[in-house]
């Protein structure tokens, strides 16, 4: 197959060498990430049901999850959730196949509850959240189920990817994963709702961290502020392992500490959605786990989209995979790679309208020796785009 693949040199300063760089990551417990995680869990559960009962993944898009914040009264020693967070599941799913009815509501609600239970230990799923499935209904004829014709793009859209991650991007990503990972053994009172904003100016990296604390572990304001100081030191120690640049860390900068009044970031569940913070699918991290205003990005929401033909999901992940593979295989001659893949509705997903690769090279490099290699690599990855489908279903690929 002759695919439309463009490979060109990009003459600009690589992102890590620019004077200023801004990078953000919303942690797994941020309301936008909660919406993404639930949407993807629902899609996985529906996909598994369809595969088990009909041998293929049927049409669905569950990328319209809304998190509507509840009300809580946190306090030192332990507070209360006063009103549960409302979580709306919407989108579309195949709910009838021939004469068979798919139990889509029970599948989707169970998937959402299981996701919350498995990821947020301080959340009482039965009491602290209310889940409502309003997923739209659709049906297919049994003949359609077993139609194995070519898979075609269901939208005209584009995906974007880049590589490699800069030092600042890596630090932001690893900081959140550290705080929501191994740090929990040292400081279990640090909740899951964490946001990290990285700002590099020349050779100084600033990390501003918003971290919800769980109130039941903390007896008073003095202990809270002592724990916050410990957290700052741990974040700094973790970050300096990744860079020789100066790193400055700021934690919960809206806190107030005065003799007459102290205000800290306290929660009952470790999640700000308990107290009025809302979230939506696609409003947070891109598929590489970051928000990168100094890079090209797609605004497409990948979480919850069907993993078979929705190019908004497939092409964003594939573009990042291609970019990373180019950097890995072509070596130190490559400073930066930008990949864009454009679909056309009705066109085979392995034959996009165009796959564009722009390369920033290091120094005086013979571009010709890389151009054909890159073209062949892109051609191969496009030919195998459908390999991503089961990786999504099995949870091997994250999209936020």
From Swiss-Prot:
GO terms, molecular function: ATP binding; magnesium ion binding; methionine adenosyltransferase activity
Pathway(s): Amino-acid biosynthesis; S-adenosyl-L-methionine biosynthesis; S-adenosyl-L-methionine from L-methionine: step 1/1
Catalytic activity line of the entry: L-methionine + ATP + H2O = S-adenosyl-L-methionine + phosphate + diphosphate
InterPro entries: AdoMet_synthase_2, AdoMet_synthase_2_family, AdoMet_synthase_3, S-AdoMet_synthetase_arc
Binding site for ATP: 136-141
Keywords, sorted A to Z: ATP-binding, Magnesium, Nucleotide-binding, One-carbon metabolism, Transferase
BP GO annotations: one-carbon metabolic process; S-adenosylmethionine biosynthetic process
Family: Belongs to the AdoMet synthase 2 family.
Job description of the protein: Catalyzes the formation of S-adenosylmethionine from methionine and ATP.
PANTHER family: S-ADENOSYLMETHIONINE SYNTHASE (PTHR36697:SF1)
Protein name per Swiss-Prot or TrEMBL: S-adenosylmethionine synthase
Species the sequence originates in: Thermoplasma volcanium (strain ATCC 51530 / DSM 4299 / JCM 9571 / NBRC 15438 / GSS1)
């Amino acid at each position: 197959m002759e695919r439309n693949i463009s490979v060109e040199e990009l003459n600009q300063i690589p992102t890590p060498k620019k004077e200023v760089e801004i990078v953000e990551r919303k942690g797994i417990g941020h309301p936008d990430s909660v919406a993404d995680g639930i949407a993807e869990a629902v899609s996985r559960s529906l996909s598994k049901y369809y595969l088990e009962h009909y041998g293929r993944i049927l049409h669905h898009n569950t990328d319209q999850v809304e998190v509507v914040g509840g009300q809580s009264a946190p306090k030192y020693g332990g507070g209360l959730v006063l009103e549960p967070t409302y979580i709306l599941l919407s989108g579309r799913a195949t709910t009838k196949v021939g004469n068979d009815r798919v139990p889509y509501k029970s599948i989707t609600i169970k998937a959402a509850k299981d996701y919350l239970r498995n990821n947020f230990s301080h959340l009482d799923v039965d009491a602290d959240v209310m889940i409502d499935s309003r997923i739209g209904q659709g049906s297919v004829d049994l003949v359609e189920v077993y139609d194995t014709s070519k898979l075609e793009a269901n939208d005209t859209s584009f995906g974007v990817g880049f590589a490699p991650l800069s030092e600042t991007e890596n630090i932001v990503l690893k900081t959140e994963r550290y705080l929501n990972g191994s740090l929990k053994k040292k400081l279990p009172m640090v909740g899951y709702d964490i946001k990290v904003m990285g700002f590099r100016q020349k050779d100084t990296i600033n990390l501003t961290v918003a971290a919800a604390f769980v109130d039941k572990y903390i007896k008073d304001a003095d202990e809270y502020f002592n724990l916050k100081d410990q957290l700052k030191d741990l974040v700094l120690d973790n970050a300096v392992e990744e860079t020789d640049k100066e790193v400055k860390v700021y934690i919960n900068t809206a806190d107030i500490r005065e003799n007459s009044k102290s205000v800290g970031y306290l929660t009952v569940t470790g999640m700000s959605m308990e107290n009025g913070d809302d979230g939506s699918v696609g409003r947070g991290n891109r598929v590489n786990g970051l928000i990168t205003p100094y890079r090209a990005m797609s605004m497409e929401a990948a979480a919850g989209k069907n993993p078979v033909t929705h190019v908004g999901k497939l092409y964003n992940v594939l573009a990042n995979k291609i970019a990373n593979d180019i950097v890995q295989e072509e070596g130190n001659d490559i400073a930066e790679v930008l990949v864009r893949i454009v679909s056309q509705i009705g066109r085979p997903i392995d034959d996009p309208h165009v796959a564009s690769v722009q390369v920033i090279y290091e120094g005086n490099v013979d571009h010709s020796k890389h151009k054909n290699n890159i073209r062949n690599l892109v051609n191969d990855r496009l030919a195998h785009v459908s390999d991503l489908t089961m990786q999504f279903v099995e949870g091997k690929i994250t999209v936020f």
